[in-house]
């Protein structure tokens, strides 16, 4: 019974330590970092001058990578089966990005994503 309680406490500590949302210990405190790589093959017109999007296609998707900032926290999360697995995630998985990147017309001198 002692081992069961000890394992449950260790699993709870590992979940709290590796939680990417509830930690207030800064970036290096066991958080999972999402890194967005720069895309390529952007718009066909005004790629640099008008909001970095242009009028043409938006280019290829920009992949997201999940990378842990603390190896011991990711090992603890894997042991507790509560962590996000390191790997490659596509841009469509982040809902807020697609909502924010919508076209809103001529706003503050730029096209594509507006000034606000």
Swiss-Prot record:
- What UniProt keywords are attached to this protein's entry? Secreted, Signal
One BP annotation, GO? chorion-containing eggshell formation
Chain ranges passing through the membrane = none
The record, for InterPro entries, names: Chorion_2 (IPR005649)
UniProt cross-references to Pfam families, sorted A to Z: Chorion_2
Give the subcellular location: Secreted
Where in this chain does the entry annotate a coiled-coil region?
none
Signal peptide: which range, if any?
A: 1-18
Work out whether the entry's keyword set contains Zinc. Answer: no
User: Might you report a single GO cellular component term?
Assistant: egg chorion
Domain of life (superkingdom) = Eukaryota
Protein family = Belongs to the chorion protein S15/S18 family.
Job of this protein: Chorion membrane (egg shell) protein; plays a role in protecting the egg from the environment.
| Listed name of the protein | Chorion protein S15
């Amino acid at each position: 019974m002692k081992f069961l309680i000890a394992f449950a406490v260790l699993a709870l500590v590992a979940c709290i330590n590796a939680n990417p949302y509830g930690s207030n210990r800064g970036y290096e405190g066991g958080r999972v970092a999402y890194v967005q790589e720069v895309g390529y093959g952007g718009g066909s017109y005004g790629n640099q001058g008008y909001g970095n999007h242009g009028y043409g296609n938006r280019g290829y998707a920009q992949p997201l990578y999940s990378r842990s900032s603390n190896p011991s926290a990711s090992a603890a999360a894997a042991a507790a089966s509560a962590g996000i697995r390191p790997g490659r995630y596509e841009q469509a998985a982040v809902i807020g990005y697609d909502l924010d990147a919508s076209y809103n017309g001529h706003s503050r001198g730029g096209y594509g994503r507006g000034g606000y």
